[in-house]
Amino acid sequence: PAFRTACAEPRGALLLLHSDPVRSAPIVGSAASGARLLILCEQNGWCHVRTRTACGWVPKSDIVLFYCRPAL
């Protein structure tokens, strides 16, 4: 599929949010900086991500690779 994460990993890769809490603002409140994220989709440089307690859109540039695995 056309979908790729910031690191060209397959959909469903687990990622870390950037450590800057201001830049992490789209999902601040329920998800701490450094939380493991699941990328649901990507559009125009933004990624729709989900954690255990929150979801939201974050800039692709704010996401750094932590651990990747294929989606189940």
Describe each region flagged by the PLM.
Residues 1-5, 36-38, 50-72:
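Boundary regions of SH3-family modules and the immediately adjacent low-complexity/disordered segments
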Residues 2, 8-9, 31, 41:
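Extracellular/periplasmic catalytic domains that process cell-envelope and extracellular macromolecules
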Residues 7-17:
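Short, basic/aromatic beta-hairpin or loop at an interaction surface
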Residues 14-16, 23, 64:
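Active-site/binding-pocket entry motifs
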Residues 19-42:
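SH3/SH3-like (including bacterial SH3b) beta-barrel domains
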Residues 44-48:
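Short aromatic-glycine-enriched beta-strand elements
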